[in-house]
Swiss-Prot record:
InterPro entries: ACP_syn_III_C, ACP_syn_III_N, FabH, Thiolase-like. It comes from Caldicellulosiruptor saccharolyticus (strain ATCC 43494 / DSM 8903 / Tp8T 6331). Residues 255-259 are annotated as: ACP-binding. Pfam families: ACP_syn_III, ACP_syn_III_C. This is Beta-ketoacyl-[acyl-carrier-protein] synthase III. The active site is at residues 114, 254, 284. The keyword Translocase does not apply. Its EC number is 2.3.1.180. The last Arg residue of the ACP-binding site is essential for the weak association between ACP/AcpP and FabH. GO terms for molecular function: 3-oxoacyl-[acyl-carrier-protein] synthase activity; beta-ketoacyl-acyl-carrier-protein synthase III activity. Keywords: Acyltransferase, Cytoplasm, Fatty acid biosynthesis, Fatty acid metabolism, Lipid biosynthesis, Lipid metabolism, Multifunctional enzyme, Transferase. The lineage of its organism: Bacteria, Bacillati, Bacillota, Bacillota incertae sedis, Caldicellulosiruptorales. It catalyses: malonyl-[ACP] + acetyl-CoA + H(+) = 3-oxobutanoyl-[ACP] + CO2 + CoA.
Length: 328
């Protein structure tokens, strides 16, 4: 019989530096009004020159571990979802393991962009259900400012840096009810970032055009994908666990764009008062978006024991993912 799994605790960390829309007005041809109306974003957090993705991940993880009162020796799995590792190897997860002295854990990264945290949750859940481990540290961490083209006004207004974490543990009660995961590689080049040195991108190309290795996005196409796939992913996972959208107490979508969030909520007939939104403060933090929002929702008392919570994300790949959680 499969072991039940619950979220034991959550944590987050964002850098101190705030980059406002008014700051961006001085960098590119844009305005606070233009950004706010089209995205809902007012500001975002940006790392300084010495802070790495690992640093962000470690702080979020430590926050989650402190809340749970769990010892380093009790963590036996670490998964980091990121598209901005500072090294190809060792993995960010192994670097986190080193910093937090998680000597009994095995550790690895996954790359699923903004869907990555839920992908990582699904992997950790199945490891725990099958008795392979008991306590998994799952982290979404990004330093997107390092791969943002700060001269492209259509994308530089969107992204921010940060990390969120959750500890998943075996439980007598069933907390995590189910998942829906998917991908569409056929349309992967609607949103991408080159890995210089490992593909057809040469050093000379990057030297001539530093923005060659930055985020590229066909915004209109990604928007059309997002407004369809988020409701689809939620409907599929609810169907799997025998629930309907009216059963949802708290809806936490990937924090990419307020118009996408409002469209998804409307299609699902979920009132906005059940939707948790914090993108006005942080922008799109990719894999960190959902765990940061989840931790804030818990901290603010938006999630109570017994609540049914839906998380859903979409991102580069193209990918999508959703999960239903009963808060126990």
């Amino acid at each position: 019989m499969a072991q039940n799994v619950k979220i034991l605790s959550t944590g987050r960390y964002v850098p101190d530096r705030v980059l406002t829309n008014y700051d961006l007005e001085k960098m590119v041809d844009t305005s606070d009004e233009w950004i706010t109306q089209r995205t809902g974003i007012k500001e975002r957090r940006i790392v300084d020159g010495t802070t790495s993705t690992t640093d962000l991940a470690v702080r979020a993880a430590k926050n989650a571990m402190d809340k749970a009162g769990i010892l380093p020796d009790d963590i036996d799995l670490v998964i980091v979802a990121t598209v901005t590792p500072e090294m190809f190897f060792p993995s960010t997860a192994c670097l986190v393991q080193k910093e937090l002295k998680l000597k009994n854990a095995f550790a690895f990264d996954i790359s699923a962009a903004c869907s990555g945290f839920i992908y990582a949750m699904a992997i950790a859940t199945h490891f725990i259900q099958n008795g392979f481990c008991k306590n998994a540290l799952v982290i979404g961490a990004e330093a997107l400012s390092r791969i943002t083209n700060w001269s492209d006004r259509s994308t530089c207004v969107l992204f921010g840096d940060g990390a969120g974490a959750a500890i998943l543990s075996s439980s007598d009660e069933q907390g995590i009810l189910g998942f829906e995961l998917g991908s569409d590689g056929e349309n992967g080049l609607l949103l991408y970032c080159h890995a210089f040195g490992l593909s057809d991108v040469t050093y000379s190309q990057v030297k001539e055009n530093p923005n060659f290795r930055k985020i590229y996005m066909e915004g209109n196409e990604v928007y059309k994908f997002a407004v369809k796939i988020m409701p689809y992913a939620v409907e599929k996972v609810l169907e799997k666990v025998g629930l309907s959208s009216s059963d949802i107490d708290v809806f936490i979508p990937h924090q990419a764009n307020i118009r996408i969030i409002e469209s998804a909520a409307k299609r699902l007939k979920i009132p906005m008062e059940k939707v948790f939104v914090n993108l006005h403060k942080y922008g799109n933090t990719s894999a960190a978006s959902i765990p940061i929002a989840l931790d804030e929702a818990v901290e603010e008392g938006r999630i109570k024991k017994g609540d049914k919570v839906v998380l859903v994300g979409f991102g580069g790949g193209l990918t999508w993912a959703s999960t239903v959680i009963k808060w126990v």
